[in-house]
Regions:
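Active-site-proximal cap/lid insertion segments
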Residues: 1-147, 160-173
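C-terminal cap/loop subdomain of S1 sulfatases and analogous C-terminal strand-loop tails that border
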Residues: 106-112, 151-154, 159-211
Length: 211
């Protein structure tokens, strides 16, 4: 959410927050150490946001802590909203035939590498939450080590709902990409997975971000 009630901020006193190890001044493996300020090569949005945060708070640490506090407040608010949805599903007798998926379209770099945005290939940005409750199939609290992608959600829903049909838009088109995660939901450790061993993520390239 863009706006979060103060009560969620109050759950995370800024003086109690600890930054992850190595979050500050960790630029050795980035292009910034050799960027030329005169050619705008360091003017990526994520770096620009980080610099603005530094300027607003006087230094990196208090700025990142304030940002982290707001991020945690947002996560807590969403968590409560998800709980409200689950309660409604259960109270209305829909728990046995309702699939619930909690995910996101991207992660977020929280100041690592001097970057404060999305759209990077670093894990903090490329990795997302993926929680699926499929009645009669998934088991609570189980995890899989198999990487999956957002493009696997639609094939999974088709499979779980026993839907039939052609996923091509027209005769000239190709079937939708992605693979059903049903085997992983049924037994996360089975290794029964038709998809690739890795997950695909992309980062656009251009004159200012071809690094």
């Amino acid at each position: 959410p863009i706006h979060v009630p103060q009560e969620y901020f109050d759950r995370f006193p800024v003086d109690k927050l600890l930054l992850p190890a190595g979050i500050l001044n960790d630029l050795d493996d980035t292009y910034l150490k050799s960027a030329d300020p005169s050619d705008g090569s360091g003017d990526d949005k994520g770096y620009r946001y980080y610099k603005l945060l530094e300027e607003s708070y006087g230094s990196s640490e208090p700025g990142i802590k304030a940002f982290l506090r707001a991020y945690l407040a947002g996560v807590a608010a969403v968590d409560d909203c998800i709980g409200t949805v689950i309660d409604a599903v259960e109270e209305n007798g829909l728990a046995d035939n309702t699939i619930i998926i909690v995910t996101s379209d991207h992660g977020w770099d929280m100041g690592q590498k001097g970057y404060l945005f999305k759209n990077t290939l670093w894990e903090d940005s490329a990795r997302i939450p993926m929680i699926i409750r499929a009645p009669g199939i998934s088991q609570a609290g189980q995890r899989t080590q198999q990487p999956v992608s957002l493009i696997d959600i639609y094939p999974t829903l088709i499979d779980l709902c026993n839907l039939q049909g052609d996923t091509r838009k027209n005769a000239q088109g190709a079937p939708l990409d992605g693979f059903s995660m049903r085997p992983l939901l049924a037994d996360p450790s089975s290794g029964n997975w038709d998809g690739p061993e890795g997950a695909l993520t992309m980062r656009f390239a251009g004159p200012k971000n071809n690094h």
